Amino acid sequence: MKTILVDDMLLDLQLFELKCADMPDFEIVGKFTDPNAAIEYAAGHVVDFALLDIDMPGMDGIHLAQALRRLRSDIIIVFATAHPKFAVEALKMKADYIIFKPFDREDI
């Protein structure tokens, strides 16, 4: 699956990448600290799977996921968050899965 990773924290983004790097089903095609850059990329490329942080300044992960779903309704959305309070919002927007930071590779 063509995968994008989005987190405003560079270290967390690198951890996302490390945990997905050798998984045969994932081809990381984009890594973004700016949600708008992720939307711009997804508008011009095939993206099957998005691993998103929720709590980001400016555009949060919920709004990013909604924008990605407008571009491609069947994109798989997985949220990674350290804040359980965001789980309800993620479920309301019909996220495919929510994982809590810190997470293990098996959680993806």
Locate predicted features:
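CheY-like receiver
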Residues: 35-108
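Generic detector of well-ordered alpha-helical packing
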Residues: 8-9, 54
